[in-house]
């Protein structure tokens, strides 16, 4: 005679993490701020006034920048990881791939569409041309209209 099987017990409902609204531009939300873990690159929330934060995922301790420090972001050119750094720094080393990235202020860069594939390109202000990383087309920028665009045969 078959024995009736009882259903698996339902696991207890996990405690719900507090829901956070999107933090304002300054990175604080009701007495909390956020930073990126120096070990695993996860976003960490911490109380205002803390001097360091221990990541619950990788246990790395990340120092909290002093109050009033403006932060900026860039994408690593080596591994495409989002990096946060103190505004005004000239270079930022990626903690994942160790690539040293040039950090330019917003007023030091300009944008132009590639003359071949129309990809939006960013270049250092004052440059005469910019090479597209997608199609290798070189687009002339600046005041000179006598220069022509060309393709590199790489």
Swiss-Prot record:
GO annotation terms (biological process): defense response to other organism; plant-type hypersensitive response; positive regulation of plant-type hypersensitive response; positive regulation of programmed cell death; regulation of removal of superoxide radicals
Region of interest: Putative zinc finger 3: 111-141
Putative zinc finger 1: annotated span: 34-64
Annotated S-S bridges: none
Main location: nucleus
GO terms assigned for molecular function: DNA binding
Subcellular location as annotated: Nucleus
Entry's Gene Ontology cellular component terms: nucleus
Residue ranges, annotated region (Putative zinc finger 2): 73-103
This protein's UniProt keywords: Apoptosis, Hypersensitive response, Nucleus, Plant defense
Record-linked NCBIfam families: LSD1
Additional remarks: Over-expression of LOL1 induces cell death.
Protein task: Positive regulator of reactive oxygen-induced cell death. May be involved in the repression of the copper/zinc superoxide dismutase CSD1 and CSD2 that detoxify accumulating superoxide before the reactive oxygen species (ROS) can trigger a cell death cascade. LSD1 and LOL1 have antagonistic effects on CSD1 and CSD2 accumulation to regulate oxidative stress-induced cell death.
This protein's name: Protein LOL1
Gene designation: LOL1
């Amino acid at each position: 005679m078959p024995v009736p099987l009882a259903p698996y017990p339902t696991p207890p409902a996990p405690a719900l993490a507090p829901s956070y609204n999107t933090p304002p531009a300054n990175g604080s939300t009701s007495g909390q701020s956020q930073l990126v873990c120096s070990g695993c690159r996860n976003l960490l929330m911490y109380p205002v006034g803390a001097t360091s934060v221990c990541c619950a995922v990788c246990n790395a301790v990340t120092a909290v920048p002093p109050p009033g420090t403006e932060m900026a972001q860039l994408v690593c050119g080596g591994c495409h990881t989002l990096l946060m750094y103190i505004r005004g720094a000239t270079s930022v080393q990626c903690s994942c791939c160790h690539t040293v990235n040039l950090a330019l202020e917003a007023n030091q860069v300009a944008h132009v569409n590639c003359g071949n594939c129309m990809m939006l390109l960013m270049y250092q202000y004052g440059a005469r041309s910019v090479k597209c990383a997608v199609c290798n087309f070189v687009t002339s920028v600046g005041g000179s209209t006598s220069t022509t665009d060309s393709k590199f045969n790489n």
